[in-house]
Amino acid sequence: MPATAPDIARRAFLAALAAPLFAGTEQDVLDLFTTLASALSEGNGLAFLDRVNHSMTDYEKLERNILALVAQNELVAAIDVIEDEGDEQTRAVQLDWLLQIRSREETGNLVRRREIVKCRLERMKKKWKVASLDPISFFAPPT
């Protein structure tokens, strides 16, 4: 059955109402990754881990890696969102993640890592949390 003018107007109105919600969701996702990058750059592993779901698979490994990484190194992190798909409860995000790692030792080397990191997000109590990161090895301290 063809849509009538009132149906089209109603659909357009509903779409207009929903548009800011999706725009807000995208901004919230960007804010989350800005927070994660800042936490690493400031050497604050606990602030990074606060935005991660503690029940995610391999959380303990990620926690060990992040805490060791920030304790042993000075970091500069930059994250670009390449792909962001999903709804207001879950998102699948691909990130171009750059991590510069300089050892705190006097003769410390500079290591640059750049990788596509796949991330799944879940909204928990009105906040986005990281539900999975792949590869977790990206966050391992240099050997």
Language-model regions: role of each:
Residues M1-A9, A15-L21:
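N-terminal secretory signal peptides
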Residues T4-P6, L69-N73, V130:
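Short, surface-exposed loop and linker segments with low hydrophobicity and enrichment for Pro/Ser/Thr
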Residues L30-T34, G45-D96:
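Short solvent-exposed beta->alpha transition segments
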Residues E88-T143:
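Exposed beta-sheet edge and beta->alpha loop/turn motif
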